[in-house]
Amino acid sequence: MAERKLKPEIMHLMILDNCDHKCNLCCNKMYDIDKIPVATVEEMKTVHTVCITGGEPFMSNINIDRFALNLKKQFPNVENVYVYTSGSAFVFNIYNFGYNFLDGINFAPKTKGDWEQLKYASAHLREDIRESIRTRKSNRLYVFKEHVDLFENNYKYIAKKLNLNVLYRTWDKEFKTPDNEIFRRLPILLN
């Protein structure tokens, strides 16, 4: 019996390769960025979820929330737009724009500095911004095994305060995209 090929439902969309971290196990070191296929209109018409990734998306020169709105307007099939961030650049850009069209923010702190930025954000954000984050469809906080003790002893309350679903993870040395997902990039990276 021939293997059935699923149509892609989820697109991980790299919008830039710029990042403020030099993580030892960064997944961007696993592939040649120039060989990542460019997202096509045909592919965009098949997905219901777009996960904005980078590099660090909040270091781009665009308004991420407006980008999410434009994706949904141009591709009505796109129901969900999520963004992945280490947290630091997100906190530095928090007041530059609102969070009305993103369906969720996935935080993946990689350093103690990232954790401290999330701590600062949870304590000092304006209430309207904090509420905007809390009311997204799905917010996640990825806690890598190297940071479990740090998280459990110092930062666990942040997840509750910002309504983040905690997912404990290990660094994958090799990322394999599931059959119903694709990894693409913009034709011009927004560094």
For the regions a language model picked out, list residue spans one by one.
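Canonical Radical SAM [4Fe-4S] cluster-binding loop centered on the CxxxCxxC motif
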Residues: 1-36
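A general structural motif
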Residues: 8-10, 45-49, 78-80, 99-102, ...
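Hydrophobic faces of well-ordered beta-strands that scaffold small-molecule active sites
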Residues: 11-13, 50-52, 81-83, 105-107, ...
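Canonical radical SAM enzyme core domain
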Residues: 29-41, 58-100, 109-119, 147-151
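Short microdomains enriched in Cys/His and/or Lys/Arg
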Residues: 38-56
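Acidic (Asp/Glu)-rich catalytic clusters
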Residues: 41-44, 95-101, 126-136
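Glycine-enriched alpha-helix->loop->beta-strand junction motifs that scaffold or abut catalytic
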Residues: 97-105, 159-164
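Auxiliary Fe-S-binding modules of radical SAM enzymes
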Residues: 131-191
